[in-house]
UniProtKB/Swiss-Prot annotation:
Positions of modified residues (Phosphothreonine): T378
Region of interest (Disordered), ranges: 1-32, 46-84, 121-194, 238-259, 326-409
Protein name (record): Nucleoprotein
Organism: Avian infectious bronchitis virus (strain Gray)
Phylogenetic lineage: Viruses, Riboviria, Orthornavirae, Pisuviricota, Pisoniviricetes
Family named by the database record: Belongs to the gammacoronavirus nucleocapsid protein family.
Length: 409
């Protein structure tokens, strides 16, 4: 039985969640991490979880008599200025006799431990399930057939049939039942004119609200793949990934606003409706190969036709007008307001203000070195922090409905 012998392992999920199949392995491992993904508190200092049913995650490999264990609190932090900042706790499930509290019997009282058992479970028995080695095995998606945790907690929904190379976005189980917010209706955009941009921005908002997690390492990998396979990660500018915007040649799409906001700009997702898929680009393009001193250059010429009776035709035209050769420009509704006359009027001898008194300069305290900050974190906490790069709650903006279908993008 693998308990606390392993070192360097943690409850934190692997940097990239990979699912190898619908069932967790029957054989234990040498790691000390939970087989299952975590449930996460929505707020700091949330009370310990309560469950509608037994609280034991579904596992078809176990008999009913073996369905018992405990949920263990994992404190989480992210680095701040000179100190670490706490974030809401995560709770991980372990079978009785495994994990960090392997020496406890079922029901033993200990802070940060919540015992759970299915009806008919033999709580006096100890599990041979072991724990997970994150380097060898994937996390198993949480499923509760008889009810999950209370409303103070959430967990990321992961499809059971997703393979290791599959793509999906993790969706917050709590977010799926929330009604859309109406706050975005107060914005400047209204009517059908900007339906396309509104729908595109809503898709981005939904993806963020559903909790897609991208680590710092994954974002860097996305931005530095082979050029033709790159995608813009959250928080990156367009020119950081695809180079400066130009006019009249390759790289001529995007105005200054789009360059700064990257994928947060709703126009990006809107225009992706018109971008060909990989297969369409390969088999529907005029392909021109050309040998150059630095290698083989492949040119793909593809034409997407937007019918004039398309309900979003005018919006596509508007975006193209703004973004094709748009470097150095911004949308009219995004231009900064001109300063008032009083502030823009040149100063004269009669109107010049009296010189201000010089404030005493404060002595600059030497900043704490990075190694001093790092000393405040344990090795387990550092590994946890690696997962928190994009773990903050996204800003929820409801841009309204539009004419686009749900699955067009």
């Amino acid at each position: 039985m693998a308990s606390g012998k392993a070192t360097g392992k943690t409850d934190a999920p692997a940097p990239v969640i990979k699912l190898g199949g619908p069932r967790p392995p029957k054989v234990g491992s040498s790691g000390n991490a939970s087989w299952f993904q975590a449930i996460k508190a929505k707020k700091l200092n949330s009370p310990q979880p309560k469950f509608e049913g037994s609280g034991v995650p579904d596992n078809e490999n176990f008999k009913t008599s073996q369905q018992h264990g405990y949920w263990r609190r994992q404190a989480r932090f992210k680095p701040g200025k000179g100190r670490r900042k706490p974030v809401p706790d995560a709770w991980y499930f372990y079978y009785t006799g495994t994990g960090p509290a392997a020496d406890l019997n079922w029901g033993d009282s200990q802070d940060g431990i919540v015992w759970v058992a299915a009806k008919g479970a033999d709580v006096k028995s100890r599990s041979n399930q072991g724990t997970r080695d994150p380097d060898k095995f994937d996390q198993y998606p949480l499923r509760f057939s008889d009810g999950g945790p209370d409303g103070n907690f959430r967990w990321d929904f992961i499809p059971l049939n997703r393979g290791r190379s599959g793509r999906s976005t993790a969706a917050s189980s709590a977010a799926s039942s929330r009604p859309p917010s109406r706050e975005g209706s107060r914005g400047r955009r209204s009517g059908s004119e900007d339906d396309l941009i509104a729908r595109a921005a809503k898709i981005i908002q939904d993806q963020q609200k559903k909790g897609s997690r991208i680590t710092k390492a994954k974002a860097d990998e996305m931005a530095h793949r082979r050029y033709c396979k790159r995608t813009i990660p959250p928080g990156y500018k367009v020119d950081q990934v695809f180079g400066p915007r130009t006019k009249g040649k390759e790289g001529n799409f995007g105005d200054d606003k789009m360059n700064e906001e990257g994928i947060k700009d709703g126009r990006v997702t809107a225009m992706l409706n018109l971008v060909p898929s990989s297969h369409a680009c390969l088999f529907g393009s005029r392909v021109t190969p050309k040998l150059q001193p630095d290698g083989l250059h492949l040119k793909f010429e593809f034409t997407t036709v937007v019918p004039r009776d398309d309900p979003q035709f005018d919006n596509y035209v508007k975006i193209c007008d703004q973004c094709v050769d748009g470097v150095g420009t911004r949308p009219k509704d995004d231009e900064p307001k001109p300063k008032s006359r009083s502030s823009s009027r040149p100063a004269t001898r009669t109107s010049s203000p009296a010189p201000r008194q010089q404030r005493l300069k404060k002595e600059k305290r030497p900043k704490k070195q990075d190694d001093e900050v790092d000393k405040a974190l344990t090795s387990d906490e550092e590994r946890n922090n690696a997962q928190l790069e994009f773990d903050d709650e996204p800003k929820v903006i409801n841009w309204g409905d539009s004419a686009l279908g749900e699955n067009e993008l």
